[in-house]
Design a protein with these regions (language model features):
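Conserved G1/Walker A P-loop phosphate-binding module
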Residues: 1-49, 162-163
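Flexible beta-alpha connector loops of hexameric P-loop NTPases
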Residues: 45-55, 111-114
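Active-site glycine-centered loops adjacent to acidic/histidine catalytic or metal-binding residues
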Residues: 41, 108, 143
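Conserved catalytic network of the ASCE P-loop NTPase/AAA+ motor domain
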Residues: 20-23, 30-35, 66-72, 95-99, ...
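Canonical P-loop GTPase G-domain recognition
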Residues: 112-163
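Hydrophobic anchor at the start of a short beta-strand
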Residues: 37, 103, 137-139
């Protein structure tokens, strides 16, 4: 949600919680003046401290969502730079690959690491993504707090949406 706020240059567009995984439903954000173009905030159930039963429900829901939405143009996968490529992250990338959608990984909270550590993580993630997903997935460092990478992300999304 904080990435959406940074992307759209609005501090309170998407509700942000200190606890990861609080988004528990699909939240659609229109992109005026572009009719029928939306950003969608998905449940971060891989990070939420919720019962296994609820996680299973979200997973089934997202399976259906990704399987039935022909209008999807790309998927931004939000990963904590300190803990990248968790099972949930791989699952989200799998959704994109099965649908033939481009995916773009943002390694968030990059301001929490030094430049060297952030760069090392970026390189390691880039290598693993190239090994497992070829050229279908791009990756960058990102910080909603310091605005690092916001312009790059905006450019990727604009390209997908033809803006």
């Amino acid at each position: 949600s904080s990435a959406l706020n940074a992307l759209c240059q609005q501090n309170a567009l998407a509700r942000v919680s200190k606890t990861p995984g609080r988004t528990q439903q699909l939240v659609f954000f229109g992109l005026p003046p572009h009719e029928n173009k939306y950003l969608v905030d998905l449940p971060g159930y891989g990070y939420a401290k919720v019962p296994q039963e609820l996680q299973a429900h979200w997973q089934a829901f997202l399976d259906g969502y990704f399987g039935s939405r022909d209008a999807l143009r790309g998927l931004v996968v939000v990963m904590d730079v300190r803990h990248p490529l968790k099972d949930y992250d791989r699952q989200m990338l799998g959704y994109a690959m099965r649908r033939g959608l481009p995916a773009h990984v943002i390694l968030t909270k990059a301001d929490k690491l030094g430049r060297g550590a952030g760069g090392n993580t970026l390189q390691a993630v880039r290598m693993e993504l190239a090994r497992n997903y070829a050229d279908s997935v791009s990756v960058q460092l990102f910080s909603g707090e310091s605005k690092l990478g916001v312009d790059e992300l905006r450019s990727v999304v604009a390209g997908w949406l033809g803006l």
